[in-house]
Amino acid sequence: MFLMPTSSELNSGQNFLTQWMTNPSRAGVILNRGFPILEADKEKRAAVDISTSFPIKGTHFSDSFSFINEEDSLLEEQKLESNSPYKPQSDKSETHTGFPCIKKGPQVAACHSAPGHQEENKNDFIPHLASEFKEGAYKDPLFKKLEQLKEVQQKKQEQLKRQQLEQLQRLMEEQEKLLTMVSGQCTLPGLSLLPDDQSQKHRSPGNTTTGERATCCFPSYVYPDPTQEETYASNILSHEQSNFCRTAHGDFVLTSKRASPNLFSEAQYQEAPVEKNNLKEENRNHPTGESILSCWEKVTEQIQEANDKNLQKHDDSSEVANIEERPIKAAIGERKQTFEDYLEEQIQLEEQELKQKQLKEAEGPLPIKAKPKQPFLKRGEGLARFTNAKSKFQKGKESKLVTNQSTSEDQPLFKMDRQQLQRKTALKNKELCADNPILKKDSKARTKSGSVTLSQKPKMLKCSNRKSLSPSGLKIQTGKKCDGQFRDQIKFEKKVTSNNKENVPECPKPCDTGCTGWNKTQGKDRLPLSTGPASRLAAKSPIRETMKESESSLDVSLQKKLETWEREKEKENLELDEFLFLEQAADEISFSSNSSFVLKILERDQQICKGHRMSSTPVKAVPQKTNPADPISHCNRSEDLDHTAREKESECEVAPKQLHSLSSADELREQPCKIRKAVQKSTSENQTEWNARDDEGVPNSDSSTNSEEQLDVTIKPSTEDRERGISSREDSPQVCDDKGPFKDTRTQEDKRRDVDLDLSDKDYSSDESSMESIKHKVSEPSRSSSLSMSKMDFDDERTWTDLEENLCNHDVVLGNESTYGTPQTCYPNNEIGILDKTIKRKIAPVKRGEDLSKSRRSRSPPTSELMMKFFPSLKPKPKSDSHLGNEPKLNINQDQPPGDNARSQVLREKIIELETEIEKFKAENASLAKLRIERESALEKLRKEIADFEQQKAKELARIEEFKKEEMRKLQKERKVFEKYTTAARTFPDKKEREEIQTLKQQIADLREDLKRKETKWSSTHSRLRSQIEMLVRENTDLREEIKVMERFRLDAWKRAEAIESSLEVEKKDKLANTXVRFQNSQISSGTQVEKYKKNYLPMQGNPPRRSKSAPPRDLGSLDKGQAASPREPPEPLNFPDPEYKEEEDQDIQGEISHPDGKVEKVYKNGCRVILFPNGTRKEVSADGKTITVTFFNGDVKQVMPDQRVIYYYAAAQTTHTTYPEGLEVLHFSSGQIEKHYPDGRKEITFPDQTVKNLFPDGQEESIFPDGTTVRVQRDGNKLIEFNNGQRELHTAQFKRREYPDGTVKTVYANGHQETKYRSGRIRVKDKEGNVLMDTEL
């Protein structure tokens, strides 16, 4: 029906966090190390622990829970009934009760081994079960059934008390048998575990739930085969029979372990051999009947308290389970057990530890040879080892010390381990602190050996912390090892073992060694812690105190070690989680109060308050508290020696001390290493004070000694231990011993409250939470919850949500809190009511015992509406379970010495105080409501005023806007007027301007007068010149007439000359040689005749000079005409430089006309005319007038040829410019360059090398070189070059391409790349450096 937990299930505890993220208030943070079973499940945690310890995979947690509740009560009945056949019946009762299918001894053994394993399953299974169970518990009629089961359980607990006596007798008988069996089976870790299981089974008749839980807590893998389990069961039965009380106490411890099964599994593994030896020693040294009776009475009371506390712790574990996704620690498994069962088991374990302490003291230390093997690290453990350096240091220390002690003390160390483990659990089960007076005695002895143990304890604690990282494994191993010795202690050892899961592989001896050294360490560190729980338990159970007095030192050290280990482990995990959170926050989250990371940390701290501290670095709540915690830790050891007396003397002081330790728990957490060092340095004082603190506030002792490591391990148990610690504080003066009277505690708490008003005091808030949980348990869970809620009202909404978690977890924690008392108490309200920390805390330590007893008594009363509102799970279930658990605890307290009464008194006082504060809160709430109404009215008035003001403002703004517009219009008008005025002012001249104007006017008048005078002159001159012009015109006319006459004369003379020449031609023919001379002579004669004629004719003219002067222009015109008529005649001026020729020319001159402007015109016989201008220019006109040659004064020569060609010679540049009639212009330069400008705009330039360049009008150029190369330049700048060999080149801005006649094309790009395409299709590409990039050869 129910399968044993598999390794995956065992590991599922690590994954349970993902299953518990449904609660928004938990915000992804696991509030408690224990699995988040319903708050209703808190009370049923004992049953649930039993059932969950049995791996119930397919069962809904809610169903299994109700079933377990029924089975829990049934188990108790069956165990009571099965007292005689302890081994089979207890097995059956446990098995049958837990799960009917598990009825056989082997199965029971498996179940016993399974508990730790199943606790791991709880870790794995509980997440599912817890979530499902919470949902089912809220929705399922299981709540009603649970309440009924609680009532039945109370009845059955009473029956159990009666049956326990009978069972004790039977156990005594079977103990003797089992002692013989155990003596042979002690060496076997399974056997040692089996006796514990059996003893638990025998206890289970008294503590049916406890025994079953113990059985469930033991991992099934501890005993792989049923025969082993049977042997284990038989050994456990014998061991339990021999140490029934211790087993009962161990059951209580186991219950705590169930709360943190990993720790207990380790603790059990480590303590299993120790318990075996201790059981043997106890069986040998102590009459089984007496020890069993005393232990049984204690167990009965503790079972009831453990049931309540286990329920609370179960709840607490549910809270703890919410802390965060990290390696689940042993505390988770512990929380699975119901608080009552857990308390019972712890009580039994503590009693057994006391017995074992006595046996150890009597027999001496048992050498622990094997060094506990360390299991594989689980998720988060790798970092956790480093984050919890303290825990590791203690672990290493423990292991070393354990090795030393193992040689020195085997059984005593085993006892000390158990007791210390139980103390650790006792921290969880604060009731165990009642035994601290006795434990103190032993813790003194332990303080001696515990000092070594203390040093060892850190090592073991470190190992346990590592194991706590892998809680399920730790639990299982612890269960294996410690089961044989005593299941209660095994549960503590489970916690320890879960912490020391690494040590588990070496099973009994390694674990025992770890436990021993760890117990020693705890004896130093944890002796106070376990002493506190022990004193509480002692206060509740005088029999257990008697038993514990013998085992007190061992139990105290063991419990303290367990607690320290668990706390360190939990703290290590929390630190690891916080470290991971910090890393995550550094990457993703901004550190704001509203950030999810901060909320996670706060919730984690709340959950730490509930079960563990999240922060790797201890929160520094109050340095003052931390310092007191250090003195306490320093004084704990010395006080631990006197802790019994002090616990008796000042139970109240323990509460204040516990309060202070609670308040300083965070400080201790903050300074855990220092505190631990200080505690370890002054271990005697620290142990004593730790014992007081364990009684007062395990969290303080945990905080001070191993505040982080122990808190890691102990936070879950610390919840129960808080409750127990509260009750034991109240019950045990020793608990109050360190702090002084309990009243002082409250006073200090009030002061602390004032100090703790800083929200950082998580111990205080944990005290508040434990106080609230106690309140919830005690008077009225509803009222206390409402009270705590009212206190929490002072906190923010997050505090409320935390409160919800804390309250729900508190109900769980109430049981756990009674067990753990301070640590959990410190934490839950730490988060919940930071503001109310002081109040809650003050009340919490004061009423922790009362609330514990009252919560037990008043679990039945309905939870307050406030609590129900915030914690619906608390509505039905926490009442019945918590009430049932509280009643047994109250009964136990009643059965126990006046310490319980004092504790219940203190709880009642706390409840009264809480009620008073609630009234205050109500009054304050009323006043706040009035203030709120007043504020709302004031706000309404303010809104009206604002509206009126807005209206008025709008009106004013409109009016102002109108006024503004009007003013703007006025300003515009004024501006226009001003502009006109300024314009007029600018136009009106000033004095200087007027003077200037006057001066200018005067000047203008003067100029006008001058102008008139000049005009008169000009007019006279003009008239005179006009008359002259007229006269010159007349003269010109006369001269023209003369020219005409002279022209006629010239023509006549020329004709005569021709006639003469014609007559001379004959002679020329005859005389060729003389012809030229004659002709010249005739010309000369004719010239002379003409000249004579002219001379004769000219004198006859009236004004020959004028005629001569006026004639040249006519002659020039006639010469021009003549040359135009004969253009073919070459220009003569350049051709006649020779003076002789001039002479001849002079001879040929027929006439010479001098013009008035200085121009001289010469007429030659051949009809040519030469005109000499005054500036040196000479113009020659041919006879026909077609050829005209003009030689300018600067040397330039212009020739007009008969074909209309115009040749102009530039002398300076030696360039000839020839213009043809068709418009062609040819320029001949001196360099030989010839330019031709065609009419269409084309230009042809022929260079001296015969290169021809053609420039076209469209911008193209063509150059033809002598070799035949042609270069054409396109308009876009591209050049096309055609070579005479047929190659062609194209030059562009991007590339240059050459095309060869064979079809090869070579392209060179601007970047230097060359591309060659061959006719065959081959392409070769080269880079600028000539490297071939591509070459495709076809």
Curated annotation (Swiss-Prot):
The modification Phosphoserine is found at residues 260, 317, 541, 590, 596, 760. Residues 542-551, 636-651, 718-765 have a biased composition (Basic and acidic residues). It is found in: Cytoplasm, Cytoskeleton, Microtubule organizing center, Centrosome; Cytoplasm, Cytoskeleton, Microtubule organizing center, Centrosome, Centriole. Residues 78-99, 190-211, 387-415, 437-480, 522-552, 612-790, 846-903, 1088-1158 are annotated as: Disordered. One of its GO terms (molecular function) is tubulin binding. The keyword Phosphoprotein applies. Residues 896-1338 are annotated as: Interaction with STIL. GO terms for cellular component: centriole; centrosome; cytoplasm; microtubule. Residues 401-410, 680-690 have a biased composition (Polar residues). Gene3D superfamilies: 2.60.450.20. It comes from the Eukaryota. Residues 781-790 have a biased composition (Low complexity). Transmembrane segments: none annotated. Keywords: Cytoplasm, Cytoskeleton, Microtubule, Phosphoprotein. Phosphorylation at Ser-590 and Ser-596 by PLK2 is required for procentriole formation and centriole elongation. Phosphorylation by PLK2 oscillates during the cell cycle: it increases at G1/S transition and decreases during the exit from mitosis. Phosphorylation at Ser-596 is also mediated by PLK4 but is not a critical step in PLK4 function in procentriole assembly. Belongs to the TCP10 family. Forms homodimers. Associates with microtubules plus ends; binds to beta-tubulin subunits exposed on microtubule outer surface at its distal tip; also associates with microtubule lattice. Associated with the gamma-tubulin complex. Interacts with the head domain of EPB41. Interacts with LYST. Interacts with CEP152 (via C-terminus). Interacts with STIL. Forms a complex with STIL and SASS6. This is Centrosomal P4.1-associated protein. The gene is CPAP.
